[in-house]
Structures are given as structure tokens and as C-alpha cells.
């Protein structure tokens, strides 16, 4: 369940993992990181 480019992580772990891996969206600090791109 990858989120789309430009979307924010909605708090779902899979979405935020995808975000971290691809580095194209905003990820929340909930999971110990903050990434935007």
C-alpha cells in the first residue's frame, strides 16, 4: 500500500515504511524519523 508521490504518510506503518524507502514523501516523526522530498 505505497502512498503516492507528494502525499503525506497517514500514520499507517506500511505507508511510512514505503515513504522512508523511496524518500519522496513526508514521513512523521512518530516512527523515529522525519523525511521530506
Swiss-Prot record:
- Describe the PTM: Disulfide bonds are present.
Q: Where is it predominantly found?
A: secreted
What is the documented function of this protein? Omega-agatoxins are antagonists of voltage-gated calcium channels. This toxin blocks calcium channels in insect central neurons but not at peripheral neuromuscular junctions. In vertebrates, it is broadly active against all high-threshold Cav1/CACNA1 channels and Cav2.2/CACNA1B channels.
| Miscellaneous comment in the UniProt entry for this protein | Negative results: this toxin does not inhibit Cav3 (T-type) channels.
> Taxonomically, which superkingdom?
Eukaryota
UniProt-annotated location(s): Secreted
- Name listed for the protein in its UniProt record: Omega-agatoxin-Aa3d
Family per similarity comment: Belongs to the neurotoxin 04 (omega-agtx) family. 03 (type II/III omega-agtx) subfamily.
Q: Which UniProt keywords apply?
A: Calcium channel impairing toxin, Disulfide bond, Ion channel impairing toxin, Neurotoxin, Secreted, Toxin, Voltage-gated calcium channel impairing toxin
Pfam families, per this entry?
Answer: Toxin_34
Keyword flag tRNA processing? no
Tissue specificity here reads: Expressed by the venom gland.
Q: Name one GO molecular function term.
A: calcium channel regulator activity
A GO CC term attached to the entry: extracellular region
Keyword Coiled coil listed? The answer is no
Q: Which InterPro entries match?
A: Omega-agatoxin_II/III_CS (IPR005853), Toxin_34 (IPR013605)
Amino acid at each position: 500500500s505505497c502512498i503516492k508521490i507528494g502525499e503525506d504518510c497517514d500514520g499507517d506503518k506500511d505507508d511510512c515504511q514505503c515513504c522512508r524507502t523511496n524518500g519522496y514523501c513526508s514521513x512523521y516523526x512518530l516512527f523515529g524519523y522525519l523525511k521530506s522530498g
